[in-house]
């Protein structure tokens, strides 16, 4: 598969009906907002085994949009060789200056899942800033076959960590479905080997002001639905 063109607005390469996202997601117009639309399917990829995309602005995902991931090895077709440039990546990283607003609807949910040629993926990893307020929202979203540990380690399909006592973090998860049944079956894993649905870790005892609201959501074939870890050290 050869790239047809570069879409500067999305920092990605366009393969027919797939948008291969391999560079940082940043706003080109100064608005600090990038929108992903349902008429495209986005594949999170590493480039040449080195670069992988990170969210560095507010990413708004439109209802009905699909975002695909992979194991980090093999191309879009799942075949690995030395000539592969773009490999579906298992982790979607949200940096300190980024956030995600994924508001689907009952009729048009947003889907985060593995591309069919890869058995699974890890999760969305959110790093909190040292100060200021940040909000991440997931409504009517499907998280399918995540929670594996490919290329790197994540604790959950939504994995939040760091921040300080000067950080205010808001997380809304509503009417979301977390289901890794096919991953557990196809890779012969125990559910204890899969990450949590939503994980929050304050490892350094930073006492982040966290407002986390999880409602009307289901969790299936995961080590646990919701997990939180704090430290006073």
Where are these regions (language model features)?
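Beta-strand/loop edge motif enriched in small/polar residues
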Residues: 2-233
């Amino acid at each position: 598969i050869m790239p047809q063109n570069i879409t500067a607005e999305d920092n990605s390469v366009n393969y027919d009906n797939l948008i291969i996202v391999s560079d940082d997601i940043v706003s080109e117009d100064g608005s600090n907002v990038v929108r992903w639309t349902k008429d495209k399917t986005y594949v999170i990829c590493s480039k040449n085994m080195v670069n992988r995309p990170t969210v560095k602005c507010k990413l708004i995902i439109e209802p009905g949009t699909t975002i695909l991931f992979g194991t980090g090895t093999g191309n879009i077709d799942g075949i690995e060789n030395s000539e592969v440039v773009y490999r579906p990546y298992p982790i979607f990283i949200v940096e300190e200056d980024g956030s995600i607003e994924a508001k689907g609807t009952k009729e048009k949910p947003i889907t985060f899942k593995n591309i069919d040629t890869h058995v699974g993926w890890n999760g969305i990893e959110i790093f909190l800033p040292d100060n200021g307020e940040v909000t991440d929202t997931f409504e009517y979203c499907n998280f399918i076959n995540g929670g594996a540990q490919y290329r790197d380690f994540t604790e959950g399909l939504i994995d939040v960590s760091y921040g300080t006592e000067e950080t205010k973090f808001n997380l809304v998860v509503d009417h979301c479905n977390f289901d890794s049944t096919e991953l557990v079956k196809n890779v012969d894993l125990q559910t204890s080997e899969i990450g949590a649905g939503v994980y929050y870790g304050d490892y350094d005892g930073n006492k982040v002001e966290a407002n986390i609201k999880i409602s009307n959501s289901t969790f299936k074939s995961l080590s646990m639905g919701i997990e939180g870890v704090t430290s006073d050290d």
